[in-house]
From Swiss-Prot:
Gene Ontology MF terms: ATP binding; dTMP kinase activity
The keyword Iron-sulfur is assigned to this record: no
Protein known as: Thymidylate kinase
Residue ranges the record marks as coiled coil: none
Family: Belongs to the thymidylate kinase family.
HAMAP family in UniProt: Thymidylate_kinase (MF_00165)
EC number from the UniProt entry: 2.7.4.9
Gene3D superfamilies referenced in this protein's UniProt entry, alphabetically: P-loop containing nucleotide triphosphate hydrolases
Lineage: Bacteria, Pseudomonadati, Thermodesulfobacteriota, Desulfovibrionia, Desulfovibrionales
Amino acid sequence: MFITFEGIEGTGKTTQIKKLTAFLEESGHNVDVTLEPGGSRIGKELRKILLNMDSTDITGECELFLYLADRAQHVGQVIKPAVEAGKIIISDRFADSTIVYQGYGRGLDPKLLRELNDVAVSGNWPDLTILLDIDPEIGLKRAMTRNLQENKMQEEGRFEAESLEFHNRVREGYLTWAALNNDRIVVVNADQTPDEIFKEIKAKVVERIKGDFVTNG
């Protein structure tokens, strides 16, 4: 089973992935956790380019193809083998990020981005996507605080440095994309306590796992 987490900066994806991983492992599941960009050896090198503040001159098209390259390697080297081995694999971001950030955020064609991602993922779309939704002003404050505390602003702060207008477009893009793919994407209000958020996530994941067991078992 393949689960992804999506959302603008500062929604608390990392915290919720840790909670979900612990819950699933305690329930007897074999779980792998990964992320984009950077889930493979090659991806780690691409991540340095994509998130670094020195890359502010990168064009939208260049950014797109670097993300697609990262994803193709990630799927082939990490995600597909884990799914085939019967594991639950959880990824912090996946193809929806590219469709939303580069499409709704940068103004590229979402339909074209979907088609390009179809090539990159080679049929390995998530079984379930958790979209953590929050007001961009709140999310950006959280993300900036985190990067400053962890001294990662230079290395990984390029998207946090984007305008509030950009992040508003991304948020609206996520909600639009979720509505178009509501069989797979569930929206969870991230402006709650971590435990309240996880309660909702756990219910959605358990429901999907039971459905997957009935279908395949």
